[in-house]
Amino acid sequence: MKTLLLTLVVVTIVCLDLGNTRICDDSNIPSERTPKRCQGGYNICYKINFPTPGYELLQIKGCAARCPTNPRFPKAECCATDNCI
């Protein structure tokens, strides 16, 4: 009985991953959501909108270790909860 209980606890810990990984949207299409589990250490979800004249809005979304910054690109929106963007 103790062995069964211990096995269940271990399986639960492995399956739940103790909440150490973030889930972010990985789709580059604004109206589509594609949740993706981030790698360890990547705890920020980000989204960068690129205006494209005559076309739909282009987005880049994903996981990051910190909020991306680049003066040549539009400002990134960042957050630190699952599926927040």
Curated annotation (Swiss-Prot):
Subcellular location field: Secreted
Tissues/organs with expression: Expressed by the venom gland.
Main location, first listed in the record: secreted
Signal sequence region: 1-21
GO cellular component, one term: extracellular region
GO MF annotation terms: toxin activity
Swiss-Prot/TrEMBL keywords: Disulfide bond, Secreted, Signal, Toxin
Cysteines joined through disulfide linkages: C24-C45, C38-C63, C67-C78, C79-C84
Pfam families: Toxin_cobra-type
Family statement: Belongs to the three-finger toxin family. Short-chain subfamily.
Protein name per UniProt: Three-finger toxin MALT0044C
